[in-house]
């Protein structure tokens, strides 16, 4: 195949920070219809920028075999599978100095992959890479997140055409610096003076050229299109080549240099024109509209022609005079599911959230690569100076677990217009949604989890193991496991730990316990099926050892939070999940998390035996640990007095030891202090003091429902205490009246209180249900009536712990 010489240097258009949405929340859509593009947000294009296009109003998709654009591109890929020629070093040799003219370098090694579906290239040896955030290449600066034109190898002749900086007028076929207007239909450029009648200025609103108006009126037979002068060669712009399918557009996801041969590469995330989608170009598609895909490819930087600019609808509507290389992107297109997804409007973030639905997982590409930390060096290429920047992709390792999937939403300008005070920084840092940089006070537990997982996946056989993690709420069980998995992911990228696949499931998100089969199978295979079919396929994989794809060869780590919610009448769900790791070659590691300590003892013997003896207890935090957690969050922020932090820590440690409650009290105390300082401008103490913490505690623990608990009858207090005690014993939020009545009888007998009887207890439970202190079913179910606390158990403990009439209640709370 003929190679394409590099295009001449072209000045990159001005880049804007809001080039395109930096992060997307992706999930295959259930519909395959092309979504409508709202005209209110993306008006039709009209501008005075220099544009040109042949007057062609065809709206049909690109012709391909079977009218399927993806099948058509498959024919192209057959020509790309030839073995690549070895690349040459871009650094010029210093030993030879001759005056002979240099020959143009052939770029047979350039292999931009089809944006329909990338071909995963198997690597035969490990390659060392140096990653960058920004490089200067051919006197043009490229950085992660830029949008660029990319050469299309299968039609290399189109890339060799001249790229005019100023396009020709569609009437006089001359290019000059006079103002031109763009037709919103055909995107053709016209001089104002060449129009009939001529225009003195660019009109407001939509503008359609006279030729398009004639075509729309149905009189195309009488249309006399202008013809270029004889010998005049019409040069197409990059925009025309892209929209006609002769070029590709991509977003730079990574930048690196191969240390072995010195060639610079990028990871490109492809854009797609509407004609290349399954629906083709629809009437509602704008002429400059592109779709961001979930398809990636690694290509050499020599394939890049120059910058373009892909904008969100809001920025696109303001880009009337930003040049010809401006495009709109409002939707993402899943090339595997052939579905559309509206892009979330996010700002300057990494595009990491698409890892769940990428057809080409990143670990499949980078597991064999040995990444190197970037050193200070001046890089030079054959084209010119190439400068490096510190950081790059090396700073983004291990980034797909847990709450790190959550993106940063766009902050309004009025919020960012002033400098944050210390109290405002403290309030933002103490939010429960804020992920801490480090996790203090749990290093011992994290080391034990790490050694357990490494020991489970390091063996080639990987027979499978189970670990049960338990502890009261708010003790850091889940976040500790997620932090361990994040660190292990970084070690996988470095090559010190063998690759694995990780599946995280929360029992609270399951409609029924059996749905966990469908969730596991979908996470492993990407296909959504019913739970019975999923159970059959999972049995074939874990029990019978059938392997389907490459992912099946990797060990699987399954994290199940709220494990106790999977308990059914016959306990078959837990039995199946815990039985799989015992099978030969299952390569399954199960981590179960629950609040109750003795859950294995409450299960059937066949299940508790499979759960194993590997258990890890997360005890409640004491006041010293809570103080360290809060101080770590507030590191570098001088907003709290030390006595205020200590007071909040001791108060929470005496009740429950819940770190989340301590953080919430401190955050509320910061809000109280901020209000106090705004009210009293002359206040000398600008920090959060003990009085602010006390006010926050009183506000939190003196809510109306707590006052109701304090004022109920003695038997009602015993009833609530029995419900809390039953919750601590079983770890189940939901219980039955039969169990609560049995617990009340035991408590009364132990402490010398007269048992009131079942009928009176039933009436007490119904009365508490009417007050909405508890949630209960109708009373006619009697012993089988289901009960559940409507508020946290900590609130019940706080309300009843210091009761003077029944001081022994504190022993059960």
Curated annotation (Swiss-Prot):
Biased composition (Basic residues): 43-52
Positions of Mg(2+) binding: 561-562
Region (Necessary and sufficient for ORC complex assembly): 436-803
Positions of region (Disordered): 1-109, 349-372
Expression across tissues: Follow a cell-cycle regulation with a peak at the G1/S-phase. Mostly expressed in flower buds, and, to a lower exent, in roots, leaves and stems.
Positions of PHD-type zinc fingers: 166-215
Entry's induction text: Regulated by E2F. Accumulates rapidly after cell cycle reactivation by sucrose addition following cell cycle arrest mediated by sucrose deprivation.
The UniProt record lists the keyword Zinc-finger: yes
Gene Ontology cellular-component terms listed: nucleus; origin recognition complex
Any one Gene Ontology molecular-function term assigned to this protein's record: histone binding
Polar residues bias (residue ranges): 11-21
Location of the motif Nuclear localization signal: 83-90
Bias-annotated ranges (Low complexity): 27-41
PROSITE patterns listed in its UniProt record: BAH, ZF_PHD_1, ZF_PHD_2
Domain BAH, first and last residues per copy: 226-344
UniProt binding sites for Zn(2+) 2: 169, 172, 191, 194
Keyword presence, Nucleus: yes
The protein's role, per its UniProt record: Essential protein required for ovules fertilization. Component of the origin recognition complex (ORC) that binds origins of replication. It has a role in both chromosomal replication and mating type transcriptional silencing. Binds to the ARS consensus sequence (ACS) of origins of replication. H3K4me3 effector that positively regulates the transcription of a subset of genes.
Subunit structure: Component of the origin recognition complex (ORC) composed of at least ORC1 (ORC1A or ORC1B), ORC2, ORC3, ORC4, ORC5 and ORC6. ORC is regulated in a cell-cycle and development dependent manner. It is sequentially assembled at the exit from anaphase of mitosis and disassembled as cells enter S phase. Interacts directly with ORC2 and ORC5. Binds mostly unmodified histone H3, and, with lower efficiency, H3K4me1 H3K4me2 and H3K4me3.
The protein, known as: Origin of replication complex subunit 1B
Gene field: ORC1B
């Amino acid at each position: 195949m003929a190679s394409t010489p590099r295009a001449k240097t072209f000045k990159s258009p001005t880049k804007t920070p809001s080039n395109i949405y930096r992060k997307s929340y992706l999930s295959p859509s259930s519909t395959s219809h092309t979504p409508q593009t709202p005209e209110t947000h993306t008006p039709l294009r009209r501008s005075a920028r220099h544009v040109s296009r042949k007057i062609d109003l065809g709206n049909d998709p690109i012709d391909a075999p079977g009218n399927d654009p993806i099948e058509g591109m498959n024919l192209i890929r057959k020509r790309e599978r030839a073995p690549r020629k070895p690349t040459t070093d871009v650094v010029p040799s210093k030993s030879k100095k001759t005056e002979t003219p240099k020959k143009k370098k052939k770029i047979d090694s350039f292999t931009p992959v089809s944006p329909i579906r990338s071909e995963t290239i198997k690597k035969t040896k490990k390659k060392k890479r140096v990653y960058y955030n920004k490089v200067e290449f051919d006197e043009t600066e490229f950085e992660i997140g830029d949008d660029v034109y990319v050469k299309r190898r299968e039609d290399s002749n189109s890339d060799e055409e001249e790229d005019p900086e100023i396009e020709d007028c569609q009437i006089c076929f001359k290019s000059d610096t006079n103002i031109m207007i763009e037709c919103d239909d055909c995107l053709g450029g016209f001089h104002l003076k060449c129009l009939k009648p001529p225009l003195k200025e660019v009109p407001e609103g939509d503008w359609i050229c006279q030729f398009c108006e004639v075509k729309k009126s149905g009189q195309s037979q009488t249309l006399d299109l202008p013809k270029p002068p004889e010998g005049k060669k019409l040069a197409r712009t990059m925009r025309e080549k892209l929209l006609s399918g002769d070029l590709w557009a991509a977003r730079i996801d990574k930048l690196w240099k191969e240390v072995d041969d010195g060639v610079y590469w990028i990871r490109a995330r492809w854009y797609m024109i509407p004609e290349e989608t399954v629906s083709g170009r629809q009437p509602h598609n704008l002429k400059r509209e592109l779709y961001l895909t979930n398809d990636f490819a690694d290509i050499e930087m020599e394939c890049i022609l120059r910058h373009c600019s892909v904008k969100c609808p809001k920025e696109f509507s303001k880009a009337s005079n930003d040049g010809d290389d401006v495009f709109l992107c409002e939707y993402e297109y899943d090339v595997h599911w052939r579905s559309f997804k509206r892009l979330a409007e996010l700002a300057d973030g990494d595009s990491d959230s698409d890892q769940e639905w990428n057809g080409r997982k990143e670990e499949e590409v980078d597991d064999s690569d040995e990444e190197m930390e970037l050193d200070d060096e001046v890089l030079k290429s054959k084209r010119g100076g190439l400068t490096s920047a510190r950081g790059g992709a090396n700073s983004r390792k291990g980034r797909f677990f847990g709450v790190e999937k959550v993106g940063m939403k766009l902050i309004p300008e009025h919020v960012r217009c002033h400098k944050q005070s210390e109290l405002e920084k403290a309030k933002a840092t103490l939010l429960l949604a804020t992920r801490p940089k480090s996790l203090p006070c749990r290093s011992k537990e994290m080391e034990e989890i790490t050694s357990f997982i490494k020991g489970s996946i390091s063996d080639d056989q990987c027979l499978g193991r189970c670990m049960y993690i338990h502890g009261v709420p708010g003790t850091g069980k889940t976040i500790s496991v997620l932090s361990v998995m994040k660190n292990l992911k970084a070690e996988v990228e470095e090559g010190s730990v063998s690759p694995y696949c990780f599946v995280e499931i929360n029992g609270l998100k399951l409609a029924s316990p059996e749905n966990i089969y469908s969730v596991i199978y979908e996470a492993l295979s990407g296909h959504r099926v019913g739970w019975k079919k999923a159970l059959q396929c999972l049995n074939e994989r874990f029990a019978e050892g059938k392997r389907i794809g490459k992912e099946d060869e990797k060990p699987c780590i399954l994290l199940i939070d709220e494990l106790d919610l999977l308990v059914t009448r016959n306990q078959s769900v837990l039995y199946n999940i815990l039985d799989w790791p015992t099978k030969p070659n299952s390569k399954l590691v199960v981590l179960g998390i629950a609040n109750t300590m003795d859950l294995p003892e409450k299960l059937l013997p066949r299940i508790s035996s499979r759960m194993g003896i590997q258990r890890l207890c997360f005890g409640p935090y004491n006041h010293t640990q809570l103080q360290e957690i809060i101080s770590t969050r507030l590191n570098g922020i001088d907003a709290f007095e030390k006595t205020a932090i200590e007071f909040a820590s001791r108060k929470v440690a005496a009740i429950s030891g819940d770190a989340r409650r301590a953080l919430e009290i401190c955050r509320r105390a910061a809000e109280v202090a901020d209000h106090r300082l705004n009210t009293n401008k002359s206040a000398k103490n600008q920090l959060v003091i003990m009085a602010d913490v006390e006010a926050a505690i009183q506000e939190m623990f003196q809510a109306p429902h707590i006052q109701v608990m304090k004022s109920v009858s003695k038997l009602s207090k015993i009833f609530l205490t029995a419900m809390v005690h039953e919750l601590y014993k079983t770890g189940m939020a939901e219980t039955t009246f039969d169990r609560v009545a049995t617990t009340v009888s035991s408590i009364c007998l132990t402490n010398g209180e007269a048992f009131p009887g079942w009928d009176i207890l039933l009436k007490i439970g119904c009365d508490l249900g009417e007050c909405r202190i508890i949630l209960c079913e109708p009373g006619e179910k009697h012993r089988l009536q289901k009960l559940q606390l409507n508020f946290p158990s900590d609130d019940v403990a706080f309300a009843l712990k210091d009761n003077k009439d029944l001081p022994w209640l504190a022993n059960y709370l």
